């Protein structure tokens, strides 16, 4: 089943993310580790700044997919 969902919005040269998770998966942990953010255990938010975190807006989807996979699976694939 779905453990975490991420809503993505472009806003003035940065990417804003809104993260929601089910009990047992920390939205806050993911936001703090990969998205310069934080919040509550199952509802958090963050951002990706261009070019500090990603080279351009077009790189956001790949970054989010890769780092969410790392967070949820504890690996680097």
Can you say where each PLM-predicted feature lies in the sequence?
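Glycine-rich, acidic loop segments that terminate in or are immediately followed by a histidine
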Residues: 1-77
